[in-house]
Amino acid sequence: MAETHSLGTKILIKIIRLYQIMISPFIGARCRFVPTCSCYGIEALKTHGLLKGGWLTLKRVLKCHPLNAGGFDPVPPKTNNNDEKK
């Protein structure tokens, strides 16, 4: 069954895809992480939705700079809030 995402989530995913298609090929591979920041952003938005996924994406992009070594940094799994309160 196909997942449904909010309009805001879909718009942000489209913006990231436009970046991947129209800008990224011209500036080359610069991301210090695996998965790349743009792939991370799409996965975070699909997994966690607009607010949390957007926040995770913003934090990840801000970490992607020459002073950070980078490395493997996957999107955290979605947790059930009810389980955390027990």
Swiss-Prot record:
Main subcellular location of this protein, as a coarse class: membrane
Family: Belongs to the UPF0161 family.
InterPro entries, A to Z: Membr_insert_effic_factor_YidD (IPR002696)
Organism from which the protein derives: Haemophilus influenzae (strain ATCC 51907 / DSM 11121 / KW20 / Rd)
Functional description taken from the UniProt entry: Could be involved in insertion of integral membrane proteins into the membrane.
Entry protein name: Putative membrane protein insertion efficiency factor
Topological type in the membrane: Peripheral membrane protein
Subcellular location field: Cell inner membrane
Entries under PANTHER family matching the protein: MEMBRANE PROTEIN INSERTION EFFICIENCY FACTOR-RELATED (PTHR33383:SF1)
A GO CC annotation given for this chain: plasma membrane
Domain of life: Bacteria
Signal peptide bounds: none
Keyword Membrane: yes
TM ranges: none
Keywords associated with the record: Cell inner membrane, Cell membrane, Membrane
One Pfam family from the record: YidD
Keyword set includes Transferase: no
